[in-house]
Amino acid sequence: MEGRLFTFLGAIGGHGQEWIILSHYVLVIGIIFIIARAATRKLQLVPTGSQNVLEAFVGGIISMGADTMGEKNARTYMPLIGSLALVIFVSNMIGVIPGFEAPTSNINFTLSLALIVFVYYNYLGIKKNGFVAYFKHFMGPMPVLAPLMFPIEIISHLSRIVSLSFRLFGSIRGDDMFLMVLLMLVPWILPLPGFFLLTAFGVLQAFIFSILTYVYIAGSIMMEHEEH
């Protein structure tokens, strides 16, 4: 299998990389749909069960951003960041289950997520501040330093694509390799602590991606606060 983990979906449709990632992404979306459906089917004033879990998740996402950009802005951008966090979290979790592969272990998938964040926060920055003012901010506080600061800022922003995508990809890909070696070397009972560790890493990576997205958006829409 060329060093790849066995996957049930791969056994159905072949072990090509495109099929593996696409089929598991569709599975992720299906799981999220089921979760959302279960949580919103019978909404109650006092939440219970899956509604309680989903409301806690939404509240956690808002609290995460409130410290960075204030609660009002955090609520405004919660749908995007909450969606990204949920997709990344579920993707990471199905990768922990033997027989499935995390879409986030593919660089093309994580690069797509990073590009969504990059394009969106720059769009918000231009919309909020204007095209000229937004890029003028890249030149720094002193005009004499503009020829130096502008290319540095451009490179810094472009590097965020690499940072977001490769951090997530590297962590989850490493988890997959760790899981493969673990299952090859020891019986099924002994790897249980490893599964808990991989679960913790998956949650952590979803958190990091979400908080960085909040930080990047805050930096693009709150430039006037940085100047004071």
UniProtKB/Swiss-Prot annotation:
Name of a matching Pfam family: ATP-synt_A
GO CC terms, sorted: plasma membrane; proton-transporting ATP synthase complex
Record's keyword terms, sorted: ATP synthesis, Cell inner membrane, Cell membrane, CF(0), Hydrogen ion transport, Ion transport, Membrane, Transmembrane, Transmembrane helix, Transport
Bilayer topology: Multi-pass membrane protein
Function: Key component of the proton channel; it plays a direct role in the translocation of protons across the membrane.
Name of the featured protein: ATP synthase subunit a
TM ranges: 16-36, 45-65, 80-100, 106-126, 138-158, 178-198, 201-221
Highest rank taxon of the organism: Bacteria
Protein species of origin: Aliarcobacter butzleri (strain RM4018)
Subunit structure: F-type ATPases have 2 components, CF(1) - the catalytic core - and CF(0) - the membrane proton channel. CF(1) has five subunits: alpha(3), beta(3), gamma(1), delta(1), epsilon(1). CF(0) has three main subunits: a(1), b(2) and c(9-12). The alpha and beta chains form an alternating ring which encloses part of the gamma chain. CF(1) is attached to CF(0) by a central stalk formed by the gamma and epsilon chains, while a peripheral stalk is formed by the delta and b chains.
Gene behind the chain: atpB
InterPro entries (UniProt xref): ATP_syn_F0_a_bact/chloroplast, ATP_synth_F0_asu, F0_ATP_A_sf
